[in-house]
Each structure stands twice: as structure tokens, then as C-alpha cells.
């Protein structure tokens, strides 16, 4: 399980360090793809395979299913960590998440999310203001 918030910068070659705590659970490589709300999703291989199985069941007759899978898979890449625990994300993913220098890596249960620091700050500020309302909307899970 991934949790926590970590701040790292892209290096001069555009590589990003993935926190050691996350790498222990991930292994030597993971899959990155376009995430929601302008971030990048990162999945361990086992989690990615579960998602692939679910997406394979979507009906090709549904336009939204076709659009989503095209975007989700076309933005995906497999990346191995180098000896320092860095990954080199594609330009497509960096542009999707507006990654320039300062990044925030967030653990979200079965995945990690990579955000530009600016987008993360905007998201967190807005979400924190509405935290109680968001929790109330999820009352059926009984936390």
C-alpha cells in the first residue's frame, strides 16, 4: 500500500526520484500513464495487470470506453528504476502533468500519483477546504 507525500525535483536530464519507501513495494519497474486531474498515475506491474483485465471487459461499442482506453494506453510506459531510484518519464506524460521542476509524489493505496507542485498545491488547498463535504459524500463506506 502506498501512502504519504514526497517532494522531489526533476534533475537536469528530466529524471525523477521515486521515494525509496515506494520502490520497496514496487520492485524494479512500474507502469506510468495519464492520470486524472492533470497528474500521472504509477502502478506496480501486478496492479497494472488487474487494471488491464478490467479494461479488457469494457464494451467496444461504447464511445467513452474507446476514448478512455485509447488515452489511457497511448500515454502508458513501462519504466525501470536506475541505481539512484530515478525514472525517466516521456515528454507526453511530463506535458500532461505540467512537470517542469518541482514535483510531488503521492501514495494513493494501490498506485502513486505524480503532480507538479503547483497543481498539487491548488488541488490540496481546494480539497482541504471541502474535506468534510467530500467525506460526507462517501458516507456509504463508513470510515
Swiss-Prot record:
Cellular component GO terms held in the UniProt record: cytoplasm; nucleoid
Pfam family, one: MraZ
Keyword annotations: Cytoplasm, DNA-binding, Repeat, Transcription, Transcription regulation
Positions of the SpoVT-AbrB domain: 5-47, 76-119
Family annotation (CDD domains): MraZ_C, MraZ_N
GO biological process: negative regulation of DNA-templated transcription initiation
Location(s), subcellular: Cytoplasm, Nucleoid
Top-rank taxon, per record: Bacteria
Molecular function (Gene Ontology), one example: transcription cis-regulatory region binding
Keyword Repeat in record: yes
Subunit structure: Forms oligomers.
NCBIfam families documented for this protein: division/cell wall cluster transcriptional repressor MraZ
Similarity comment: family membership: Belongs to the MraZ family.
Protein name: Transcriptional regulator MraZ
Amino acid at each position: 500500500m502506498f501512502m504519504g507525500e514526497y517532494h522531489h525535483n526533476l534533475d537536469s536530464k528530466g529524471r525523477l526520484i521515486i521515494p525509496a519507501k515506494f520502490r520497496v513495494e514496487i520492485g524494479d519497474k512500474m507502469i506510468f500513464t495519464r492520470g486524472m486531474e492533470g497528474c500521472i498515475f504509477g502502478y506496480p506491474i501486478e496492479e497494472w495487470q488487474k487494471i488491464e483485465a478490467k479494461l479488457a471487459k469494457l464494451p467496444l461499442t461504447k464511445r467513452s470506453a474507446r476514448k478512455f482506453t485509447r488515452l489511457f494506453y497511448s500515454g502508458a510506459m513501462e519504466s525501470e528504476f536506475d541505481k539512484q531510484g530515478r525514472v525517466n518519464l516521456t515528454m507526453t506524460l511530463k506535458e500532461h502533468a505540467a512537470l517542469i521542476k518541482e514535483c510531488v509524489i503521492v501514495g494513493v493505496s494501490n498506485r502513486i500519483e505524480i503532480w507538479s507542485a503547483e497543481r498539487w498545491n491548488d488541488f490540496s488547498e481546494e480539497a482541504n477546504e471541502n474535506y468534510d463535504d467530500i467525506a460526507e459524500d462517501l458516507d456509504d463506506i463508513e470510515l
